[in-house]
Amino acid sequence: MSKLHIKKGDIVFVNAGEDKGKTGRVLQVLVKDNRAIVEGINVVSKHTKPNAKNPQGGIEKKEAPIHLSNLNVVDPKSGKATRIGRKLNEKGALVRYSKKSGEEIK
């Protein structure tokens, strides 16, 4: 299994698919499926029957998972999509960094 470069809370850029060119914050990473749920990206309509939780029922909009290969982390310095690397910092901890600018990604 490969390492995941995207974590919950990251700002990501969509590089393929229907929402190509948009950016959003990662709400959840689905490790087993190699997918992530991103705020405002890949929004689908879900038809729900009336139930105790939602007595009205109807159509609700929600974000569907998108594959991690279609996402790039946004560089905190330039605001553009970048690849991610890992290196040891001064304290000896492994941190993620932007390959474009060398800036550490929190």
UniProtKB/Swiss-Prot annotation:
One Gene Ontology CC term in the entry: ribosome
Q: Which stretches are annotated as coiled coil?
A: none
Q: Which organism is it from?
A: Parabacteroides distasonis (strain ATCC 8503 / DSM 20701 / CIP 104284 / JCM 5825 / NCTC 11152)
A biological process from GO: translation
Superkingdom of this protein's organism: Bacteria
Question: How does the annotation summarize its subunit structure?
Answer: Part of the 50S ribosomal subunit.
- Gene symbol here is rplX
Report the protein name in the record.
Large ribosomal subunit protein uL24
Similarity comment text for this entry:
Belongs to the universal ribosomal protein uL24 family.
| Single Gene Ontology MF annotation | rRNA binding
InterPro entries linked? KOW, Rib_uL2_dom2, Ribosomal_uL24, Ribosomal_uL24_KOW, Translation_prot_SH3-like_sf
NCBIfam families assigned to the protein according to its UniProt record, in alphabetical order? rplX_bact (TIGR01079)
Q: Give a short account of what the protein does.
A: One of two assembly initiator proteins, it binds directly to the 5'-end of the 23S rRNA, where it nucleates assembly of the 50S subunit. One of the proteins that surrounds the polypeptide exit tunnel on the outside of the subunit.
What keywords appear on the UniProt entry?
Ribonucleoprotein, Ribosomal protein, RNA-binding, rRNA-binding
Can the keyword Ribonucleoprotein be found in this entry's annotation? yes
PANTHER family in the record, alphabetically?
MITOCHONDRIAL RIBOSOMAL PROTEIN L24
Q: Which HAMAP family match?
A: Ribosomal_uL24_B
Listed Pfam families: KOW, ribosomal_L24
